[in-house]
Amino acid sequence: MHVISDECVKCGACASTCPTGAIEEGETKYVVTDSCIDCGACEAVCPTGAISAE
């Protein structure tokens, strides 16, 4: 998973949904760390579609 910085509005929905705590707040966007298990929960809750598995 990765965050598309142009789309991310830093709402925090992804970070609060992540079951492994793999999403951390960065300076301009949220960052997906190595503890991501690719479950897709963050992608499903992102209101702007800023998270992609590609």
From Swiss-Prot:
[4Fe-4S] cluster 2 binds at C18, C36, C39, C42. GO terms for cellular component: cytoplasm. The keyword Iron-sulfur applies. It comes from the Bacteria. Binds 2 [4Fe-4S] clusters. SUPFAM superfamilies: 4Fe-4S ferredoxins (SSF54862). Its cofactor is [4Fe-4S] cluster. Gene3D superfamilies: 3.30.70.20. [4Fe-4S] cluster 1 binds at C8, C11, C14, C46. One of its GO terms (molecular function) is 4 iron, 4 sulfur cluster binding. This is Ferredoxin. Ferredoxins are iron-sulfur proteins that transfer electrons in a wide variety of metabolic reactions. Keywords: 4Fe-4S, Electron transport, Iron, Iron-sulfur, Metal-binding, Repeat, Transport. Residues 2-28, 29-54 form the 4Fe-4S ferredoxin-type domain.
